[in-house]
C-alpha cells in the first residue's frame, strides 16, 4: 500500500466541502516505477527498435486515459489526483496497439488516433463499469486491447510484433530493462512468484506445441515460424515478458492470496497456451495470449473461492489439506495439456501446393552471378538469412528462369508450373511459343518485399537479376516464394 500525501492547492470560501486539493505522484508508488520502465521501453522503441508507432499516438492514448480518469473522479472527490493508474493503462495500450499504415520515424502522425483514443477510453471505463468485490474484474488495458483486436480486426488494429528485430545493443538494453525492472518491482510487491509460475508453465506448454510440429505465419518471417524459432519467439519475446511482469501482476485484478495467486498464474498460462495452440497466424497468436488473461480474470472469483486467502494460505499446506483439491488441479491441468496437444497437431498454416520435381538444370559459370548483394530489407525479417542463403536462392531463381524459357519454347504448361505460381504462372501460360534465349547473369540483388494491401501477409524475397539475353543487356526483378531453396516465381515486376 502506497501512502499518498494530499496537498491543497485551491481553497474556496465557505465550508470545507468546497475545498479542492491536489495529490501529486509519490516516488514510492510502484505504479510510477512501472511507468518508468514502460516509458523507457517506448523511448528505445522509437530510437533503436523501429516501432511503427508515433509519439502523437502515444500522447493521444495517455491523454485520453488521464482525462477520463480525472473527469470520473475529480468532481466527486474534489481531489485532483495524479492519474497514475490511468496513465499506466494508456501506456499499456500504446505499447501493444499498432495501426497498420503507421511508419516508423513519422513522429507526429495522428494516423488512426481514434483507435488509440477509443481503446484507452475503454480501458479506463472498464475499471468503473465491470467490477466484482469492490475492484475491477479485468485488467483495464488487457480487456480493452482484446476487444479492439477482436472487433476491429487486423486491418485496423494490430498487436506489436512478437519478434522485435535481430539482437542489437538497443534490443539488449530493452531485455535488460524489462527483466531487471520486472524482477525488482514484482519482488517488492511480493508477486515475483506469480510471474515465475506463469513463465515456467507457459514456456513448457510452448515447448509441447513446438515439439508437436506446430507453426504459424508471421509478417516478419519468410516461411512458417516453427520448431526452436517458434519456442524462442513465444517464450522469450519482449512482448511476452512485459505481459509476464507488468500485466498479469496487476494487484487490483489478480487473484489475492499466495495459493490463489499461483493458481491464477498457472491458469492464465494454461488458458493462453490452449488458445495459442489452435492459431496459425502471429496476429491470432498474439490475441490468444492476451485473451487467456481475460478468461481467467472472468473466473477470478472462483479461483479465490477455491483457494481463499487466510492463515492457511501457504501453497504446500493448502495442497496437502484436501485430496479433492489435488484431483481438481491435476484434472484441469491434464485437460489443458490435452487441448494444447490437440490444437498443436490439428492447426497449422496451409501447406504450399505440392508440385512435381523440378527438372535438373546445370548452370554455366556465366550464369552464376559474380556479385550477389543483400538489400536492407533482409534485416527486418526473423530467422537467419545470410550470404550463402542468398546465393542459393539466386541460383534457384536463375534455374527457374531457364526452365520457364524452355517451357515457353515447348508450350509445356505443366513444366512451367513446377517453378512458377500465381500471376507469373498465368502470364507464362499465355505467352506464345518462342525460342529460348541464351542467358547469362552478371549480378543479383536479394531483398524483401511486402504486399501493401495485406498487412499480415508473409514477406516475399525480391530477386533482381542483371545480365544478357542473346547478347542484349537484360535485367528483371522477381518476387519469389522461397526460404533458402526451391524458389517458385510468383510475380515478375515490370520495369519502370
For each feature predicted by the language model, list its residue ranges.
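Membrane-interface helix-loop-helix junctions at boundaries between adjacent transmembrane segments
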Residues: 75, 79-169
Amino acid at each position: 500500500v502506497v501512502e499518498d500525501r494530499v496537498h491543497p492547492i485551491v481553497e474556496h470560501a465557505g465550508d470545507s466541502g468546497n475545498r479542492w486539493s491536489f495529490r501529486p505522484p509519490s516516488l514510492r508508488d510502484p505504479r510510477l516505477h512501472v511507468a518508468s520502465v514502460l516509458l523507457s521501453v517506448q523511448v528505445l522503441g522509437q530510437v533503436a527498435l523501429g516501432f511503427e508507432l508515433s509519439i502523437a499516438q502515444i500522447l493521444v492514448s495517455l491523454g485520453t486515459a488521464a482525462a477520463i480518469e480525472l473527469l470520473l473522479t475529480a468532481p466527486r472527490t474534489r481531489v485532483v489526483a495524479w492519474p497514475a493508474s490511468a496513465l499506466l493503462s494508456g501506456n499499456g495500450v500504446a505499447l501493444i496497439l499498432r495501426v497498420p499504415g503507421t511508419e516508423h520515424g513519422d513522429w507526429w502522425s495522428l494516423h488512426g488516433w481514434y483507435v488509440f483514443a477509443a481503446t484507452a477510453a475503454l480501458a479506463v471505463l472498464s475499471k468503473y463499469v465491470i467490477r466484482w468485490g469492490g475492484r475491477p474484474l479485468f485488467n483495464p488495458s488487457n480487456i480493452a486491447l482484446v476487444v479492439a483486436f477482436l472487433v476491429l480486426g487486423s486491418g485496423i488494429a494490430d498487436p506489436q510484433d512478437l519478434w522485435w528485430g535481430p539482437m542489437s545493443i538497443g534490443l539488449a538494453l530493452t531485455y535488460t530493462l524489462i527483466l531487471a525492472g520486472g524482477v525488482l518491482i514484482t519482488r517488492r510487491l511480493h508477486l515475483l512468484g506469480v510471474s515465475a509460475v506463469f513463465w515456467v508453465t507457459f514456456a513448457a506448454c510452448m515447448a509441447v506445441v513446438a515439439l508437436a510440429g506446430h507453426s504459424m505465419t508471421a509478417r516478419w518471417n519468410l516461411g512458417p515460424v516453427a520448431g526452436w524459432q517458434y519456442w524462442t519467439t513465444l517464450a522469450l519475446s519482449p512482448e511476452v515478458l512485459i505481459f509476464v511482469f507488468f500485466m498479469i501482476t496487476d494487484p487490483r485484478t489478480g487473484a489475492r492470496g499466495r495459493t490463489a495467486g499461483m493458481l491464477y498464474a498457472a491458469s492464465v498460462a494454461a488458458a493462453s497456451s490452449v488458445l495459442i495452440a489452435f492459431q496459425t497466424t502471429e496476429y491470432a497468436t498474439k490475441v490468444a495470449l492476451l485473451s487467456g488473461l481475460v478468461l481467467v480474470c472472468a473466473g477470478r472469483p472462483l479461483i479465490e473461492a477455491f483457494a481463499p486467502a487466510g492463515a492457511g494460505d501457504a501453497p504446500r499446506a493448502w495442497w496437502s489439506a484436501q485430496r479433492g483439491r489435488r484431483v481438481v488441479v491435476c484434472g484441469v491441468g491434464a485437460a489443458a495439456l490435452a487441448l494444447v496437444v490437440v490444437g498443436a497437431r490439428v492447426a497449422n498454416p496451409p501447406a504450399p501446393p505440392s508440385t512435381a520435381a523440378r527438372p535438373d538444370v546445370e548452370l554455366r559459370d556465366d550464369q552464376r552471378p559474380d556479385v550477389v548483394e543483400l538489400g536492407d530489407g533482409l534485416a527486418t525479417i526473423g530467422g537467419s538469412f545470410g550470404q550463402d542463403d542468398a546465393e542459393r536462392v539466386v541460383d534457384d531463381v536463375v534455374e527457374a528462369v531457364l526452365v520457364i524459357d524452355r517451357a515457353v519454347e515447348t508450350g509445356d504448361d505443366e513444366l512451367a508450373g513446377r517453378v512458377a505460381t500465381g500471376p507469373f504462372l498465368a502470364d507464362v501460360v499465355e505467352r506464345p511459343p518462342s525460342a529460348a534465349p541464351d542467358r547469362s547473369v552478371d549480378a543479383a540483388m536479394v531483398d524483401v518485399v511486402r504486399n501493401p494491401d495485406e498487412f499480415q501477409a508473409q514477406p516475399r524475397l525480391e530477386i533482381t537479376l542483371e545480365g544478357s539475353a542473346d547478347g542484349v543487356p537484360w535485367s528483371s526483378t522477381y518476387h519469389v516464394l522461397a526460404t533458402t531453396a526451391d524458389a517458385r516465381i510468383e510475380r515478375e515486376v515490370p520495369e519502370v
